[in-house]
Amino acid sequence: QTVAELAAEGIDYRGCLYGGFMLTPAGPKVLEFNARFGDPETQVVLPRLKNDLVEVMLACANCELDQIELDWRDEWAVAVVLTSAGYPGSYEKGKVITGIEDAEAMENVTVYHAGTAVVDGQLVTNGGRVLAVTALGDTFENARNLAYEACEKIDFEGKTLRHDIGLRALRGRDAWDV
């Protein structure tokens, strides 16, 4: 419907269209649309894509998506975001981050930087959402466990993270069951 509305306004939109939604008892509600990939949503989807992303985006720009077949890895993916204490409110910056190398050395784990910076040769926090840790696994539970295991290897003062990512799925509850 959104793309149809853009077309009705004379806009020939081609590219990423990220929708932010919230599940409510009345059903899903739109929070926002962005003309970019969503973060961390993309960080859990793209590791499963076997195709060259550049080729996919060029096909999109040239209205040729119907000429390619997306090929996906069979693995499950889970991403966990590491945040600074206080996020989404006020938070401190400049906290030294350690353990990323250990997490990145784990098979099927990728660490994505968001709110980080290098100061005096040290990697430090520089935002509320600091890192996203994505893991792939042959089952959802294995991917989730691997992601949390990798998160344990990373440390910085004030590190916070949600411990409930994927629990509804593990407990057999529908994600829409709010």
Model-derived features: positions:
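Short beta-strand elements
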Residues: 19-23, 28-37, 115
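Active-site "cap" helix and flanking loop/linker of ATP-utilizing ligase/carboxylase catalytic domains
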Residues: 1-18, 34-108
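Generic structural motif
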Residues: 26, 38-40, 83-87, 116, ...
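Short coil/turn motifs at beta-sheet boundaries
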Residues: 14, 26, 73, 124-126
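Generic C-terminus detector
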Residues: 117-120, 124-178
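Generic long, charged, amphipathic alpha-helical segments
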Residues: 93-132
